[in-house]
Every structure is written in C-alpha cells, then in structure tokens.
UniProtKB/Swiss-Prot annotation:
Enzyme kind, highest EC tier: lyase
UniProt catalytic activity: 5-amino-1-(5-phospho-beta-D-ribosyl)imidazole + S-adenosyl-L-methionine = 4-amino-2-methyl-5-(phosphooxymethyl)pyrimidine + CO + 5'-deoxyadenosine + formate + L-methionine + 3 H(+)
One GO MF term attached to the UniProt entry: carbon-carbon lyase activity
Alphabetized Pfam families for the sequence: ThiC-associated, ThiC_Rad_SAM
Descriptive protein name: Phosphomethylpyrimidine synthase
Cofactor requirements of the protein: [4Fe-4S] cluster
Biological processes, Gene Ontology terms: thiamine biosynthetic process; thiamine diphosphate biosynthetic process
Positions bound to [4Fe-4S] cluster: C581, C584, C589
Binding site for substrate: N239, M268, Y297, H333, S353, R354, G355, D394, G395, L396, R397, E433, Y460
GO cellular component: cytosol
Keyword field contains RNA-binding: no
Gene name tied to this protein: thiC
Highest taxon, organism lineage: Bacteria
Organism: Salmonella paratyphi C (strain RKS4594)
Amino acid sequence: MSTTTLTRREQRAKAQHFIDTLEGTAFPNSKRIYVTGSQHDIRVPMREIQLSPTLIGGSKDNPQFEENEAVPVYDTSGPYGDPEVAINVQQGLAKLRQPWIDARNDSEELDDRSSAYTRERLADDGLDDLRFTGLLTPKRAKAGKCVTQLHYARKGIITPEMEFIAIRENMGRERIRSEVLRHQHPGMNFGARLPENITPEFVRDEVAAGRAIIPANINHPESEPMIIGRNFLVKVNANIGNSAVTSSIEEEVEKLVWSTRWGADTVMDLSTGRYIHETREWILRNSPVPIGTVPIYQALEKVNGIAEDLTWEAFRDTLLEQAEQGVDYFTIHAGVLLRYVPMTAKRLTGIVSRGGSIMAKWCLSHHKENFLFEHFREICEICAAYDISLSLGDGLRPGSIQDANDEAQFSELHTLGELTKIAWEYDVQVMIEGPGHVPMHMIQRNMTEELESCHEAPFYTLGPLTTDIAPGYDHFTSGIGAAMIGWFGCAMLCYVTPKEHLGLPNKEDVKQGLITYKIAAHAADLAKGHPGAQIRDNAMSKARFEFRWEDQFNLALDPFTARAYHDETLPQESGKVAHFCSMCGPKFCSMKISQEVRDYAAAQAIEVGMADMSENFRAKGGEIYLKREEV
C-alpha cells in the first residue's frame, strides 16, 4: 500500500516504526570510510563504492582479471550511513563539534533560556510526552567575544571545521590512481576559483572574503561541517516541515533522515503547524547536516496567523528561541521594502513568497518600513552571538515566467547587497536567496547581478523553474534551471519536489526532488570543471562498456531504482552478467558491437604487424642472423 493511500494514523505509525527500527545502513556494495585530519577527532566520513574486477582474458578455466579501484564519494548521511554506529533517535546524535567549540573558550552556558516562549513551553507539563528528553543547555558568546566562523577566518585562524571541510571537498580523489578515472574535460567556470587541491587555508580565505559560509550554530554540535560557496561543490537543500493539516513529529524526523540519506547537504524546517518548537528540537538533535528555518513563519503562528499583529518583540523572541535550539541559518526577508511593494502590482502572480507576502502585508497595513530591515543590526547581533548564518530571503522573487527579472526582483536584490555589507560588519556569514521562475535565456543575468550587487556572497536559488506548464513535474522544470545556474556560479540549490504547487511532499517526493537536484548539482560541477567531478562518471562509463551490471547499479545515484528497472525485463541472475540489456538485445547492443570491433581491430593490427615483419625478414635475405654491419 503506497503512502498516498494510508490514513493519517497509519502514516504516523509507519514513521514511528521507521524511527524505532532505525539502524546505520550503507548503500549496496559501499562502505563507510573516514579520512583523518591533523588531530585525532577530525574524522571526515565518505562513502566508498566497491567495484568488481574486469575480465581481460584467459580461458574459461583460468580467467584473467584486472582490479577496478573503489570510488570515494561525498556522503551527507552522517551516522545513519555507518552500519557500525548504534542509532537512537530518542538520545540524538553524538556531539561531534562540542570539543572544538569548548576548546575555543569564547562561549558560555546560559543559566536560563533567553526566549520567553521557550520558558513557557518548558513549563508546560502537557508537552512532556512530545518533548525531546535530552535537551542541551544552550550556549552563547561570552561578553565581548564573537564565535562565528567568519570572525575566526578574518583573524587568520583555521578552525577544525575548516580542515574538516577541506578534506571533505576533496572527496578522497587523491586515492584514485587510474588515468582512465582521473581524465576530465576542462570546464567553463565563469570566473570561479577551482584549485586542484582544496586546503584548509583556501577554505579560510574563501570564508574570510565572504564568498563562502559554514553554517554551524554553536548549539548544533551534532552537525558535520560543510561549506556553501561557488568555488566548492554545488550543494543541495531539502525542505521538510509540517503544516496545519498534515504531518507529525515522527514523520518530520523520518523525512530528515531520509533527506540526508539521499544527499541533502542542508535541510530547512518550514513547519507551520502544531508543535513547531518540539518538532524542531527533535530534528536538530538528530541532524548531521545544518538546519535552516524561516523564523517569520513561527512568529506569525504566535500572533494567530494575523500578519498585521506581528511585532519586532515577538520576532526577536523567536530568533532567540531558535538560536538556542541550534538553528544554523535563518531566512530573513529584510529586503521587502515598503517602496518596492507597489512594483509587484503589475505582476501576473504578485508576491508568491510566503515570507515576502507576510512582510508586504505588514508594511501596507501599518504604512511603515519593514521591521526586519529597521532592526537588521539587532538581528546581526543575535546571529553573531551563536554563529547563525543569514540567508537573505528573496521575498519578491518571480512566481511565474512572465514576472521574471522584473524591477521588483532586482530592486530587492540590490537591497540584499546593502544588508550583506552590514552583516559583515558584525562578522555574520551571509548567503543570498534567488528565484524562482525564470526562462532559460534569462537565468545567467540573475547570477551576474547577484555577484555584482551582493559582493560575491554565495547564491542560493529555488530552481529556477524554466517553464510553468508542468505541475506534477516541477522537479524537472526546475532541475533544468538549477543545473544552469549552478554552472554559472550558484552555490546551493533548493530542491523542488513533484508536489510543488500541489501539496506537502511525502517521503517519496523528498527522494525524487533530491535525486533530481543531485543530478543538477553534479552536472553543474562537471560543466565548471570542478576537479575530480568526473571520476564517478568515468567509473560508470567503464562499467557500462564492460557490462559490469552490478557496478553500474552501485555507482548510480539511486542504485535501487537502477536495479529495479533492469530487473523488470531481465530479472534472472544471468541478466546481470549478460553483454546486453533488454533495450537492444544480444545482437544489436552498440557496446557489444563496439567491443567486437575493437577486438577485431586489435587482431587485425597484430596480423598486419606480423605480415610487415615477415616481409622485412624476406627483404633482408631470409637470414636468421644478420651481419654486424646490418644490425
């Protein structure tokens, strides 16, 4: 029975079973490896795909094989991808970064929560059954201290997080010796800096320049360090979160784990339903990747969904609440200014961003400037105290092809550039959010405008969707735009699922969105010429030409679907060693024919060579031994 036919109670029970039985799991024929850094507790996880040997000759009784190197790949699954790690969602993940945070001695534990709302929730006994039991005592910067990775980078300090990232971004490609696998086409990088080897110093320099961010709240020590920047691998974000009509805590934790398994580099919790606070705590304590939020959503819930009733005080309390839970980055729609709202009146689809529409309504109802803009420096002070990165929201992004690249969109973008410089005054890390719905020929301008207006801060886009005619397939329409803008320099792509514009995504939708966007991100890395990006493609092509079916499945982004499609028509074990598939059959397989041509050409070359030598022998008189002067 599919999840779409399950009742709400059945869906929740299924999610609870998933959590209760959760174990570390490796992909088929893969194993978890750890690459160590300069200190013993820097252990960077990667997945190594084991490959079978290639048959190169010999006889049936005595075949000769050539080994194929294992292929290391980037792994976002954290402890969930390691069969040796015991998983207990009730206890949460190990606090990987806690020793590094403590060693810096620039933060301190709080005696009480700073948020009045958090204190109210903790005092409510009726929430005991929902509450995560292993609550952390929150930390914040000591007086006069700054705890951000940008602050350290500007001081010339290479943190353990930066070294971890350098190792991770290299993807273990130094382990590969095969020239066939190492071959790579030169890319077109549009001005990106892509060194052959990423060093901790390079990471530090990129962060110091504001070209990259490391989302790493000191209250989320469970997260594995990662980086977002155009001079690094293109990253993918997955959105999860409940709504007023569907989903539960169990289902959101399940979606979190599922997202990291299928390659989410970060996850945004966009919950708008009941128990937002409790749901987020469960997610953070069990997340190996950075978690982002849109705080205005929860602030709106606190005023019963009435945008006009929002206040700076309620929003500030929400920031403190989420900061002390461990949220790694905030989307803040501070660029939706009162004077920009009329620009959207002539649009076909108006303001489609939830956060943007909330702030636009507030501005119009009070005829005041956006309080997020007015209080932006105070927002930066909060972020600096916990190392929360800012994701400056594109509240005026286009919601249709017709509205792409209009005055409202780019006016807001220019304001985001001004806000970026203010955030940098506080050593707060910044990335910029982008559209939206943009046809292919108008996408590159978005990237060039962002780099110029926002001082090369990382760009983070939703797609963009390249056409509006395909509800149910918007992971395709947006995946096209995502691949293009990733190539042009976008640092992180926010996935779109098949349910976009239609409903809240379920577990399978999350997977489909992530696979689509991992394809887009990887295609962008290839096009940029990112060092090592082609290794997996080369390994796949070699396996395909040699009819190593098991290796083809295991090298795929989704081994299970690849195997299932193959086995629909050739389910027998013999089909997995056959030199053909059901598309062409045994007589018309182009690769089989190519192999035969290659073998024939090699045999012909030997025959021609022997004939040449024979003719040469006869031309020299047919003597077995030549005279010294003839040698």
